[in-house]
Regions:
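Short, flexible, basic/aromatic active-site loop/helix in glycosyltransferases
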Residues: 154-175
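A conserved acidic beta->alpha catalytic loop
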Residues: 59-67, 112-113
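Short beta-strand-to-loop acidic/aromatic patch adjacent to the donor-nucleotide binding site
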Residues: 102-113
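Short, well-formed alpha-helical segments that are part of the catalytic scaffolds
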Residues: 33-48
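Acidic donor-binding loop at a coil-to-helix junction in glycosyltransferase catalytic cores
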Residues: 202-208
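Conserved donor NDP-sugar-binding/catalytic core segment of glycosyltransferases
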Residues: 117-149
Length: 289
């Protein structure tokens, strides 16, 4: 149950309610020119269970009303220069600035629109003390094109699971799939692992998940915790994203070496400084969509 910035777990023993655990949360959202979709996201964050004082927005110099939207909902805000934004580093800053106020940090992107129950259902993953991070199901936006819908269907099924090092033979690199568009991290483990890298161009979430699993922790996929999130990329944008994913896996080759390819298959081939992907569906399995 939710109560004033915490989730409370309880059990019924001999007909009596026994409090089991109390966990404090902060929802952190990096923003930049969020527009109409951010307005809807901010509205739903509050409508579906979060309290405004436990939402923390880091804005990278928006020129529109993004910051005003955050303030109008009573969110805490921090403004940084756009040149200082970094996918990993900015999220690390959100954790550092709330490290004494939360047991779990929930990350949303400005274009992820939470759905009913998103908060308590992703927090429930941390009832297992071995879970280091969790991520929710992403359904496509109502205006998503076929490729965007495919990506969400392929990566975000209706059945949740928990993965650990023992999962790699069957799941391969999907063992450490996660997405910071809608994710949550146990603060104590986040500190222990060292947080996100600040040097990667993307996939700071998979990087952390891989480190955590290799350290003996688990990753939870919470299929009943839902947000709407997708991108209608142009062909050029799709190419750039896939190229960047290839660069990431070349730079962080230890992840593939530890976990293999999708479903345990080795599906990436090296050619000079580029990585060629066998097919888009296989690439989606590498966890950056």
């Amino acid at each position: 149950m939710l109560l004033h910035g915490v989730t409370i777990s309880f059990a019924v023993i001999s007909g009596e309610f026994i409090w089991v655990d109390i966990m404090r949360y902060i929802i952190a959202v990096p923003t930049y020119n969020g527009g109409a979709v951010w307005r809807e996201s901010a509205k739903n964050i509050i409508a579906f269970g979060a309290e405004s004082q436990f939402v923390y927005v880091i804005d990278s110099g928006s020129k529109d009303d993004t910051l005003n939207v955050a303030k109008s909902h009573g969110f805490k805000t921090l403004s940084i220069e756009s040149k200082d934004f970094n996918h990993g580093g900015t999220r690390n800053l959100a954790v550092e600035n709330n490290i004494d106020n939360a047991d779990v940090i929930i990350f949303l992107t400005q274009d992820a629109i939470p759905q009913p129950g998103f908060l308590e259902k992703i927090m429930a993953a941390f009832d297992d003390p071995a879970v280091a991070c969790a991520y929710g199901r992403q359904l496509p936006h109502v205006d998503a094109n076929p490729l965007a819908r495919h990506a969400r269907t392929f990566n975000y099924g209706a059945t949740g699971y928990v993965s650990d090092m023992g999962s790699k033979d069957t799941m391969g690199i999907k063992t450490v799939f996660t997405s910071n568009s809608f994710s949550a991290y146990r603060v104590s483990t986040f500190k222990e692992i060292g947080g996100f890298p600040s040097s990667t161009i993307l996939a700071e979430d998979m990087y952390f998940a891989a480190k955590a699993v290799m350290a003996g922790y688990k990753v939870a996929y919470c299929a009943d915790a839902v947000a709407r999130h997708s991108h209608n990329y142009s062909p050029a944008e799709e190419f750039k994203r896939y190229f960047d994913i290839g660069v990431f896996h070349q730079d962080e080759a230890w992840i593939r070496q530890a976990f293999g390819g999708a479903g345990g298959r080795k599906e990436i081939y090296s050619f000079g400084t580029e990585l060629l992907i066998k097919k888009c569906a296989a690439l989606d399995s590498y966890g950056m969509y």
